[in-house]
Amino acid sequence: MRIIVITGMSGSGKSTAVRALEDEGFYCIDNLPMRLFRPFVELIEKSGDSYRGIVLVADIRGREFLKGFENTFQTLRDQGHGVEIFFIDASDDVLIRRFSETRRRHPAEEQCTVSEGIRIERERLSTLRQMATRIIDSSDFNVHQLKELILRIVRGEDAETPMVIEIKSFGFRYGIPLESSIVMDVRFLPNPFFVPRLKPGSGLDDEVREYILDNPKTATFLDCFFPMLDMLVPAHRQEGKYYLTISIGCTGGRHRSVAIAEATAMYLRADWPTVRITHRDIEKGQQ
């Protein structure tokens, strides 16, 4: 029988995942004591009901579960059951924002801040996270996107699903994009803003782009930046990310960041075909 354990951080989207799997025909149960789990699996098998499998939800509330899961899972695997562990995570900033929006108390402790509760929860779930067969980062997902991803995974449709990479140029004077996973500051590069004939243009114009990219300082930077992305992008994919935002900023978001963002997108498309590019502040920088 297929057994999926849904676990992870509070506020990461476990309830969304469970609802998706329930609609998909799985029998879902929340925080079943570990000593009852093996008898429960046997009971479902003997019932003859046509469930696609069992989903067990485990989180920080199930102290008994967290103590006994390792031996139980291994026993079930030895009996021929397919046991998968989906650990759903999100960045601390995203979790704090979600708790703020819902006005819920963090379940880790009665009296502590949300950020402290998140720290405690990460410590308690660290072993389970290491055991996970799938780590899913929901930081960049809305409810519908997370549900779609969970269904693709359980249907075996996600193996060929590439990570969507968004390259976003921006101006620091207008703020760093909140959705950023990686932020690169290129304000140290030569600035066309101070060249009268180039100032009215943007990083999309050939003359402006050549002024930036042909500079030796830019060449040295890209020789370091691109190999770094060759390491970072696959690492984010392995951590369960299906969306990655790489934000590149200069002062106004019109010249340097645009040119470097275009060069970065061109470089990454060789290995990651789903690269898209957005120039958030290119028109603001004209003002």
From Swiss-Prot:
Could you say which residues bind GTP here? D59, I60, R61, G62
SUPFAM superfamilies with a match to the protein in the record = P-loop containing nucleoside triphosphate hydrolases (SSF52540)
Which Pfam families does the record associate with it?
PapZ_C, RapZ-like_N
What highest taxon heads this organism's lineage?
Bacteria
InterPro entries, per database record: P-loop_NTPase, RapZ-like, RapZ-like_N, RapZ_C
* Keyword field: ATP-binding, GTP-binding, Nucleotide-binding
* Summary of the function given for this chain in its UniProt record: Displays ATPase and GTPase activities.
Signal peptide per UniProt: none
Which residues of this UniProt protein bind ATP? G8, M9, S10, G11, S12, G13, K14, S15
| Family, per entry | Belongs to the RapZ-like family.
Source species taxonomy: Bacteria, Pseudomonadati, Thermodesulfobacteriota, Desulfuromonadia, Desulfuromonadales
For this protein, what is any one GO molecular function term?
ATP binding
Q: What is this protein called?
A: Nucleotide-binding protein Ppro_0977
